[in-house]
């Protein structure tokens, strides 16, 4: 180990041994000194390490099949949508890694439009993709956006959410994913341009065009318009992947008319239902134009994929199969109180039926289970005599209380204790 000073009493760098006269700067710490040259060397080593991590993060992009396989672990069904998303995401990051040009051929950006009913898995798919790729991710609601100059959020606020998700690391944010939900709500109210100002419709589509395509945007770090004198953050949106999603209620009749079918036909109910279910998969850009999206906006979303409404079987699978399945989560929570939880098959089907009746899809499953489990989860942590709790179909319908199996083998119905 180097001494802190030599025979002449000159201070030395504790790492390289150079004296204070041989270097430009010597920084003192508790019982240790480091020179500017060693600081520079350490900085280079750290930057090299961070650079290689960044390289792995964006260059080792999983292949489309690998992406689809990971999506399968978290999202049930929607195979066509998963395939389309896997290919689009893979191509997007391949394009980034090739610097957008191969042999003077410029590769276009693959922004994605997902069309599907509420609770069909649009947001979950986008979130899971960002987790697979380990990139910053932000969700924005199109209904809160308005044109500049009107009350509401500017489109730049979407970019601020992504920058915040990347901990203000602009380089990372520039390779992130933004999911814009309820995109159908900014459609023009009429197919023909109106003289009346459409503050939250066509104007917002126009405002989104540049950031979807790729531009250097100026983002207010504090958001909104309340701080006009703040310095702006510059961010290049060229390599940000935008995924837009919406239910697009009213799109099916437009597709039917294009296919030459009457909106109200004479086919059997079963056949009509099958056709209705498959209609969204036949969507074309021209249908979206008739719905109220402007041509330039549709052109910025080249990948269009549709999600099917989830049927009873799919909802039951969602409850039990994914890695983060709701039933597994509730089982784990009760397990922490030394109680085993069991949902009977018919109970799961009853929960699925309720979600379909409410038209909430997978999104409504948690609130249904929460309502069933609330009293049980309030009471059981205070009881030490319960070994197992069984949720039956009658429990879900509200006809009977959950069954409790005590440690001595006795089976009783749960009785809600009311406070005096």
UniProtKB/Swiss-Prot annotation:
Occurrences of domain ClpX-type ZB (ranges): 1-54
Biological processes annotated in GO: cell division; proteolysis involved in protein catabolic process
GO molecular function: ATP binding; ATP hydrolysis activity; ATP-dependent protein folding chaperone; protein dimerization activity; unfolded protein binding; zinc ion binding
Residues the record lists as binding Zn(2+): 13, 16, 35, 38
Binding site for ATP: 117-124
Family, as annotated: Belongs to the ClpX chaperone family.
Its biological purpose: ATP-dependent specificity component of the Clp protease. It directs the protease to specific substrates. Can perform chaperone functions in the absence of ClpP.
Protein name: ATP-dependent Clp protease ATP-binding subunit ClpX
Origin species: Anoxybacillus flavithermus (strain DSM 21510 / WK1)
